[in-house]
């Protein structure tokens, strides 16, 4: 699996904000999850929380335009204690709050570290956006981009910064492929052509192995962060 931190492009995997808090302690690793509306970002966040919460101290920041719907879903599912889940209401296009003006998200992350820290990991979920959505290097250290087979098997071929430069591309809802006519082999080939050595995971949260491959990728990131 590709875990090279020395990328030369200016995409999301370039070096981000200072790795230390003002008091000199090491801050949490921050991983952003972006992708189109309905691709399964929140369900993936929930599954990751369940997979990682026993081994790591983690928290979540969600983004919605005018509501707290994603955060409320995570709270209902009890994936983490309530104080470890917070919501940002962006009031504008989702990419604005994760790339152009990150102040609200950065404050939310820092408040979580102050209030429930020390934390190993903060997951920052973007509101649903298009294929161009990327996170600011000042907000997250790595980005996962989630698409789904119901959006069409041409999505990887269409590219866009989210697809081509995210540190991990997740093709979600693979169990639906036979019902929507999506060719997983074609999607895999197109993703490889767009992303070269950057990793791609095909995922169904309804069938084994579920979120396990993505959770393993996150664990590897955490190990590298702590090294």
UniProtKB/Swiss-Prot annotation:
The record's listing under Pfam families reads: cobW
Select a single GO molecular function from the record's annotations and give it. Answer: GTPase activity
**Alphabetized UniProt keyword annotations:** Chaperone, Cytoplasm, GTP-binding, Nickel insertion, Nucleotide-binding
- GO biological process, alphabetically ordered: urea catabolic process
Q: Which NCBIfam families match?
A: ureG
Q: How does it assemble?
A: Homodimer. UreD, UreF and UreG form a complex that acts as a GTP-hydrolysis-dependent molecular chaperone, activating the urease apoprotein by helping to assemble the nickel containing metallocenter of UreC. The UreE protein probably delivers the nickel.
PANTHER family (UniProt xref): UREASE ACCESSORY PROTEIN G
Its protein name is Urease accessory protein UreG
Read off the lineage from the record: Bacteria, Bacillati, Actinomycetota, Actinomycetes, Kitasatosporales
